[in-house]
């Protein structure tokens, strides 16, 4: 694996130092600039639980909804976990197109999102315990099943008003879920971007390296990998055959 160029988009505090780690938002900025973190803690914007997180030292601050700061055909692997569900669908498609651009022919992408099919099935089955086990315990007490289900789609501030000024400021810089995917919908998006060999994978299993460190959220996630073709881009070939 020596010499491979690997990028983790939306790395959060789980980045690995031999990857290019990219993230954006207030938490990433505070991790990148410790003096801002101290100020945020002092005025109460940053919850104490976030102070224990160790972000990667080589963190790149970049909004992945915009053009990625990498050259064409530069990356061997792209990994992105629990990121695109925070984007509008068209923004997620734009990012996946960018991933296709920066991957080398034969390179792999691994996309991990909350599994919409699983969540829907657990709701229909009235599996209250599943949602309680996979919901922030601070917000799960005495909440009915429908509310637990809705919390996968909407932000906390949609459920109840944020009482403090600093709490409101914090929520302005955080993003709830905007669009969820099942295997069929995510596969179609990847296919439309030009990817082939699209497969559903298991937790910490696949072609992308370092999954034993990178993969998390086993109970609720959909894991999908796809490859950039080594031959002519199928989208361009199709346009010539029309």
What is the role of each PLM region?
Residues 90-98, 104, 108-242:
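S-adenosyl-L-methionine-dependent methyltransferase catalytic module, highlighting the catalytic core
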Residues 4-121, 184, 224-229:
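Conserved SAM-binding loop
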